[in-house]
């Protein structure tokens, strides 16, 4: 199994259990999230509670909640929305911190394509949800979620050069 960690913080952000597709010249990875129910679920065992005097809600766990699988699996923490100015400020700092950690061709490709990827994200800024890794470190990567028209499940966007592949 492969796990992808934030290169700056070491937070686990993704694994190969969630396939990705490259967008914006490979600078961004798009990963499809899915709403799931967490906690116990009602199991119908064929009994007729009304005939047996049981309560209709018997056996239902009130603690069951809906979560997005990626957020739950990697304990991503949602952040307040950014406006354009805040986002550009974050990206400048992130690029400054990440670039020296990249090597050779990866660094060159990142420098060449990050501006277009940033513009791509800026076009969606009003629709984005922002997440950080479990440590909630200020300098860590942001993970972006949004909803495509007609879809109930959000895709997530990762800045690919900021991820470090670890074999487990």
Curated annotation (Swiss-Prot):
Compartment(s) where it occurs, according to its Swiss-Prot or TrEMBL record: Cytoplasm
Identification of the protein by name: Translationally-controlled tumor protein homolog
Domain of life: Eukaryota
Subcellular location, principal: cytoplasm
Residue span(s) of domain TCTP: 1-168
Keywords, alphabetical: Calcium, Cytoplasm
Calcium found in the keyword field: yes
Molecular function terms, GO-annotated: calcium ion binding
Pfam family, one: TCTP
Gene3D superfamilies assigned to the protein according to its UniProt record, in alphabetical order: Metal Binding Protein, Guanine Nucleotide Exchange Factor, Chain A
Family per similarity comment: Belongs to the TCTP family.
S-S bridge residues: none
Function (record text): Involved in calcium binding and microtubule stabilization.
A single GO cellular-component term on record: cytoplasm
């Amino acid at each position: 199994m492969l796990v992808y960690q934030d290169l700056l913080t070491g937070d686990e952000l993704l694994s190969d259990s969630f396939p990705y597709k490259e967008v914006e010249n490979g600078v961004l990875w798009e990963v499809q999230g899915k709403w799931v129910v967490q906690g116990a679920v009602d199991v119908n065992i064929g009994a007729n509670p009304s005939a047996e005097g049981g309560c209709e809600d018997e056996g239902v766990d009130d603690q069951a909640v809906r979560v997005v699988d990626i957020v739950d699996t990697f304990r991503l923490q949602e952040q307040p929305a950014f406006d354009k100015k805040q986002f550009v400020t974050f990206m400048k700092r992130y690029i400054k911190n990440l670039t020296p950690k990249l090597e050779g061709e990866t660094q060159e490709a990142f420098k060449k394509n990050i501006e277009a990827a940033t513009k791509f994200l800026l076009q969606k800024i009003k629709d984005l949800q922002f997440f950080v890794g479990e440590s909630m470190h200020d300098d860590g990567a942001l993970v972006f979620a949004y909803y495509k028209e007609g879809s109930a499940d959000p895709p997530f966007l990762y800045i690919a050069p900021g991820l470090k592949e670890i074999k487990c």
